[in-house]
Structure formats: structure tokens, C-alpha cells
A protein has these predicted regions:
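SAM-dependent transferase fold signal centered on methyltransferase-like domains
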Residues: 1-211
Length: 211
């Protein structure tokens, strides 16, 4: 993702503005990629509440509104770090995040490990994550543009795996069964346990564990 200096300046000047009004005034800024700028402005506005440490960092790139809504908050990412840190047995050298997304969980959890892998099948999210990890000096994180199941099948065993299944079906509707999430961790259980000493799974409280 490459933004021109004019677009970056527009983002800086309008980062607290109402994006609906900006969209209506797009014709006033012929040298600015207004749609791309609005994605960045909305992303930063969400991050100010959700991920304040990143919002305060100049140069962070943000994904679309849906990805920002779905990503972990700084508070919940730190909670996962505490889970890993409080686990007093086993090695903590290698870590793989199979559902990378915006990269919040991977960025925070990678601090616990010597080597980390961020896996994501959406190329745009990989590009954003690679930029942000470099900006944050997270040199221990490798970005992998790959399907999570295919990567899991091919990867070498690691100490920890993190996976956050999407609770949406192919039509964007919400699911209530673990088996309907993407990926289906119930079907991958044996392979996950074969590939990692510890597996940390984030599940929505809205899921019905009896299904």
C-alpha cells in the first residue's frame, strides 16, 4: 500500500474530521486519494479507543472498517500476553499466529518469543502488517501470505500457536457452532496439538459449545 505525500498530508490534517463530510467534499481534492485516506482516518479514529499505543504512533497503516471492528483491542491483546507469560512450563522460543488479521495479537504476543510467524490469506492485510511490524521494529516476526490450514499442514512444530476463528459464514452471517467457524478448530484439533506444545484459541462467547 503506497500513499502519496498529498494523501498523507490530507490524512494528518483531517484525522479527527467527520469522514462522511470528507467523502462529500472529495471533488475538492483532485490530487488526493480520498477513499484511501478515509480508510486511514476511520482506522485511526477506531484505534484511538481500541489500540491507543498504535494510534499514537505516526505512520501506522490501517485496514478497512470491518477488519478494524474485528481486530483485538490493546487490552485483550495484553490479556493474551498474560496467559502466555503466566504459563510456567514449556519453551517460549517459537510462535505462530494462524489468523493474523490486522496483526494486533501477533505484535503483542511476539514480545514473548524469539521467533514469530504471522499467517494471513488476505494479501492487503499482509502488506499492512509487514509495514507496521517494520515500523514497530518487530524484527522477530515473519509475515506469511498463506491459507492458515495449508500453512499448518506444512509448518515445522512450534512452542505456541494462536488461532482466532472467524465467526462468519460465506455470506457474512454470524455462526453459532465452532464447526461453522473459519477455520474449524474442532476438525483441526489433532493437527494443532501435533504442531504446537501449546495452542491458544480465541472463541466468541456467543458460540454454542454443545453444537
Amino acid at each position: 500500500m503506497t500513499l502519496t505525500e498529498e494523501t498523507l498530508q490530507f490524512i494528518r490534517e483531517h484525522r479527527k474530521d467527520n469522514v462522511r463530510n470528507l467523502a462529500l467534499q472529495a471533488h475538492k481534492y483532485p490530487t488526493v486519494d480520498v477513499p484511501a485516506a478515509i480508510i486511514q482516518i476511520v482506522g485511526r479514529q477506531i484505534a484511538e479507543e481500541k489500540i491507543p499505543a498504535w494510534a499514537a504512533r505516526e505512520g501506522i497503516l490501517y485496514p478497512t472498517h470491518l477488519s478494524m471492528e474485528q481486530c483485538s483491542s490493546e487490552v485483550t491483546a495484553n490479556y493474551k500476553v498474560k496467559i502466555v507469560s503466566d504459563t510456567g512450563y514449556g519453551s517460549r522460543k517459537t510462535f505462530t499466529d494462524l489468523t493474523g488479521g490486522f496483526g494486533i495479537d501477533c505484535a503483542f504476543l511476539s514480545a514473548c518469543f524469539q521467533q514469530s510467524a504471522y499467517v494471513e490469506r488476505q494479501e492487503t492485510l499482509c502488506t499492512i502488517a509487514a509495514h507496521n511490524f517494520s515500523l514497530l521494529n518487530l524484527k522477530q516476526v515473519m509475515v506469511c501470505h498463506e491459507d492458515s490450514i495449508r500453512y499448518l499442514q506444512m509448518m515445522e512444530p512450534v512452542d505456541w500457536i494462536f488461532i482466532d476463528p472467524a465467526r462468519r459464514d460465506g455470506h457474512g452471517g454470524k455462526t453459532i457452532a465452532i464447526s461453522e467457524c473459519e477455520p474449524d478448530v474442532s476438525a483441526l484439533e489433532n493437527l494443532l496439538l501435533e504442531k504446537a506444545s501449546h495452542v491458544l484459541v480465541k472463541l466468541s462467547p456467543m458460540l454454542d459449545l454443545t453444537l
